[in-house]
Amino acid sequence: MKQKKHVGKRLLAGLLGAVLLQTAVSIPSGLQASAADDVEYNYAKALQYSIYFYDGNMCGTEVAENNRYQWRGNCHTYDAQVPLQPMGEDKVGTNLSQSFIDQYRDILDPDGDGYVDVSGGFHDAGDHVKFGMPENYAASTLGWGYYEFRDSYKKTGQDDHIETILRYFNDYLMKCTFLDENGEVVAHCYQVGDGDIDHAYWNSPEVDTMARPAFFLTGDKPQTDYVASAAASLAINYLNFKDTDPDYAAQSLDYAKALFQFAKSHEKQLSDNADGPKSYYVSSKWEDDYCWAAAWLFKITGDESYLQEIYPYYDYYAAPCYVYCWNDMWNGVQCILGEISEDKPAKEGEHVYPQFIEKYKEAAEKSPYEEMDCWASVAKAITTYMTGGVGTITPAGYFWLNTWGSARYN
């Protein structure tokens, strides 16, 4: 079993390393001391540089105090004052109906100033829209990497930086989640900005004045992928801060549980049922995000009801069929279920369920004789990816999946 755990750790390192090193940005000269240039393959430097992508894309009223770039400042501060009204042709306001606003005004606008605050978070890429699916994916993946390999961040002096980024992500997710007096989700803002408007004009975010409508999901139009992926990030955030800031960690976990409960108790629907995504980041499934969140919540709580939510939707065969990305979390799910299936927890305080595969076979009516191993599936997925089985490997080693955002898959 010890050897199996070591295999799992190596597979996690390979998967998360490929995801993290997607970005290449210019770095402030004064912040490069911990990343020496005198080695052929400087992974410490690659780790350091990759995090600065998020400084470049940070948004809101607290950019200046949290950012490591001198040329970045507060931007889209008016996201803190989105008029709490149905949007018109000018795209000012929200996608909420007037009746919904009237019913939940005290929750959406507790200070009664007529606005809803959805400031913070991160821009998507070169544009300035805050898209929920890639944002939640990035938040959970960065958090996962820090949780699994915290010592590496500390040894390279990147722990303070990544914690700043993780707090900024997850503070935004909590701000965008509106709870009633019972702690139940009333609404969740999954997007700020309109892709069509934003992509028609390119400028510095600090001087942007374009309309930035806020899009919410509610019980009347639930979107499982958004709330589940946000729940996963907040659950991981609990693990990352439970020993250093227990009150903040507990708050993150409360929000994670509330968001997952919303996903569980409402009709399962995709993000393309609403008016925000249009053709931008329309998810093709919700099951992967749902299982992703449930697996983390079981790992934290040991509550087997979360595993019961996984059994009907878990696709054991999916991981090698595509890459780990915002629209396909199955490789991540497989890794966490691999850890859950072990005899002993990977880290102190985690919960395991060694009989998971057998229980899944029973629930999914699989043959009891079929061999299933989560880590073997992950290994197959990495081999398939590295050999171009789900994309094209160029002569220089660049992995090309499709024309849109190809660098994200390298």
Where do the model's predicted regions map?
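Sec-dependent signal peptide cleavage junction
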Residues: 24-37
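Hydrophobic core
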Residues: 16-25
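Glycan-recognition and catalytic cores of secretory/periplasmic carbohydrate-active enzymes
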Residues: 35-136, 140-410
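Small side chains
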Residues: 14-17, 230
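Bacterial N-terminal signal peptides that target proteins for export
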Residues: 2-15
